[in-house]
Design a protein with these regions (language model features):
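Cross-family detector of peptidyl-prolyl cis-trans isomerase
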Residues: 19-205
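Sec-dependent bacterial lipoprotein signal peptides
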Residues: 1-19
Length: 205
């Protein structure tokens, strides 16, 4: 009977020791993962700080231009203002705008003619995060310079075309018009009907 008790106790001791070793073996993995996350966060903080320093330098170099710091993490200045209107685009509207994209040295990456007129269903389409928030500040016919960090443009991946990794950008945006989706649909139907009538007239003539 004593032998059985000793055997059971020995097996239990081995099992307990094995569990402790397994737990100890897993700890470095958790520590390693936590360390990696901390390093990643630190790198991102340094990256953002560096880009914000670049933007601050641009603002200092343009002392005559009044830049405003937004609550969304970007800076902007007015080229053309509209003080008569109070409405701005909101979710459920369609914004019609033009824009061009430059680097912080003012070199054109995408020209307005290259990008063409833009039609944006507010907060329902996947566009640059900075633009998404910036457009909602604008009144009709306003033109604004936006300074964006890469975190709210194309980030680490760029756009896989002309914009590389972690590039802060200057975007110059003109809001031509905006309207509700219902009004936009009506306008598109009216244009479609008008085009169809013109084609029929040309065929008859």
């Amino acid at each position: 009977m004593k032998k059985i008790i000793y055997t059971i106790a020995f097996v239990f001791l081995l099992a307990n020791t094995s569990c402790q070793k397994n737990q100890e073996a897993r700890k470095p993995i958790a520590n390693s993962s936590g360390s990696f996350m901390k390093q990643s966060v630190d790198r991102n903080k340094k990256l953002i700080a560096g880009e914000e320093a670049e933007i601050a330098r641009v603002i200092r170099q343009n002392k005559r231009v009044k830049f405003i710091a937004s609550t969304k993490g970007f800076w902007y200045s007015y080229i053309a203002t509209n003080t008569k209107d109070t409405l701005t685009p909101k979710k459920g509207d369609v914004a019609l705008f033009d824009y061009e994209v430059k680097d912080l040295k003012g070199r054109i990456i995408y020209s307005q003619s290259e990008l063409g007129p833009q039609t944006y269903f507010v907060d329902k389409q996947n566009i640059m995060m900075g633009l998404r928030d910036g457009i909602k500040l604008m009144h009709r016919n306003e033109k604004i310079n936006f300074l964006f960090t890469s975190a709210i443009t194309y980030g680490y991946h760029g756009d896989n075309k002309k914009i590389g990794t972690n590039k802060p950008l200057l975007c110059i945006v003109t809001l031509r018009d905006f309207m509700s989706e219902a009004n936009y649909d009506q306008k598109m139907k009216a244009n479609s009907t008008s085009d169809s009538t013109t084609q029929n007239d040309s065929i008859i003539n």
